A protein has these predicted regions:
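Electrostatic, structured charged patches in enzyme active sites and in nucleic-acid/phosphate-binding
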Residues: 1-123
Length: 123
């Protein structure tokens, strides 16, 4: 039985980094050239944005009098942007290289706009 990925994409290595698809690796190469040309700056990959913080039980006082943090009831919900960079006008751009738009992605895209006021650019 062959181990295949759900949407048929293959991990690709480019300049020492591993990307989730050929399309994402090609975009990384394009952004690298744009950065070298001075058109963009501060290119970052896999930047985490917390959409909903983790939910915890209330803190309690421990046996020795210290504050004991409550245990996690629900883990945080986070979005990882494929690329974040500054354009030539000084604006921050958040990009996602999309092949197939899953329901989870669509919800996270809407939460990014609602929580952080950031519109994701889809490539």
């Amino acid at each position: 039985m062959r181990n295949t990925r759900k949407y048929g994409n293959k991990k690709v290595r480019y300049q020492g980094a591993v990307y989730d698809s050929r399309k994402e690796a090609r975009r990384a190469a394009e952004l690298s050239l744009l950065e070298k040309a001075g058109k963009i700056s501060n290119v970052q990959t896999q930047v985490k944005f917390v959409l909903i913080p983790s939910q915890r039980e209330p803190d309690t006082v421990g046996k020795r009098g210290g504050i004991k943090q409550g245990k996690v009831i629900e883990k945080e919900c986070a979005y990882y942007a494929d690329f974040v960079y500054k354009d030539d006008k000084g604006r921050w751009i958040v990009e996602d290289t999309k092949g197939f738009r899953t329901k989870d992605y669509i919800i996270k895209r809407k939460l990014m706009l609602y929580v952080h006021g950031i519109k994701i650019t889809e490539i």
